[in-house]
A protein has these predicted regions:
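Positively charged n-region of N-terminal signal peptides that target proteins for export
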Residues: 1-4
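Formylglycine-dependent sulfatase
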Residues: 23-268
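Bacterial N-terminal signal peptides
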Residues: 6-19
């Protein structure tokens, strides 16, 4: 596993040097900046740089990065949200971490304390670390990104249907979606309070739908120092533009953690 993690870190560093040379030059030469973008439900033939006109999808910005940098033709990836993120962040096969199926609110499996974490490795090497978007590695306080090496997290914890309740109009008239994704109660997380009307209390931070976007911070990437605040519900309407909010949060983090100002590289 350690060899795999080391190889993973090397690949990320190589990828950053190839694709983000300008940004990397701002950080100390031996520690390049790392900006990794993960997309859900995207296959190789959804990206123009790979399908080369055989499919209808157009991805000009991604294609430009590929044309100016490097493309990888051989790779390993898990084919679900939770399993893919587990493999990426830990370097472990998801089965070993007990994180194979997509996580639902209140799930008893989650990313356990002490699990190897790429973010923690990089934080220990002097990186400023942040994650933005969907996490999907469990909703326990111990599973949040800011308990596993990230100093900041802004985003949401499940797939969109679980965030909003059931999104189909003919079903959405139900007051809750308990039969699909049971509401549950907070575990003690500084800044978040148990919502009214929850049922089946569990050791988790999920809410009755629509569930909230949260903003968490931890100066040293540990659960002990993490605190979170509610950034408002991720409704069906908000989900149409939440990517713009995520982009704004990433840009703000990069501005605040500019290596020219902090003398530290970043991992986002």
């Amino acid at each position: 596993m350690n060899r795999f993690v080391h190889l993973l870190c090397f690949v990320f560093s190589f990828l950053t040097l190839a694709l983000f040379g300008t940004a990397a030059a701002q950080a100390p030469a031996e520690k390049p900046n790392i900006l990794f973008i993960m997309g859900d439900d995207i296959g190789i033939m959804n990206v123009g740089a790979y399908h080369r006109g055989l499919m209808v999808g157009e991805t000009p910005n991604i294609d430009r990065i590929a044309n100016e940098g490097a493309q990888f033709m051989t790779y390993y990836a898990e084919q679900s949200c939770t399993a893919g993120r587990t493999a990426f962040f830990t370097g472990m096969h998801p089965l070993r971490a007990g994180m194979v199926m997509p996580q639902l609110p209140g799930a008893t499996s989650y990313l356990l304390p002490g699990t190897p974490s790429l973010a923690k490795f990089l934080l220990d090497l002097g990186y400023n670390t942040g994650e933005f978007g969907k996490n999907h590695l469990g909703d326990h306080a111990a599973a949040l990104p800011t308990a596993h090496g990230f100093q900041e997290f802004w985003g949401y914890l499940y797939h969109l249907d679980a965030m909003q309740g059931v999104s189909f109009p003919d079903i959405n008239s139900s007051p809750t979606d308990q039969a699909v994704v049971p509401p549950c109660e907070n575990t003690p997380v500084k800044g978040l309070k148990p919502p009214a009307g929850t049922v089946n209390p569990r050791d988790a931070i999920c809410m009755t739908p629509p569930r909230p976007v949260i903003h968490c911070t931890s100066s040293n990437g540990t659960q002990k120092n993490q605190s979170c605040k509610d950034e408002g519900p991720l409704t069906l309407e908000r989900s149409k533009t939440v990517d713009e909010e995520i982009s704004a949060q990433v840009i703000d983090f990069l501005d605040r953690n500019d290596p020219d100002k902090t003398d530290k590289p970043f991992f986002v």
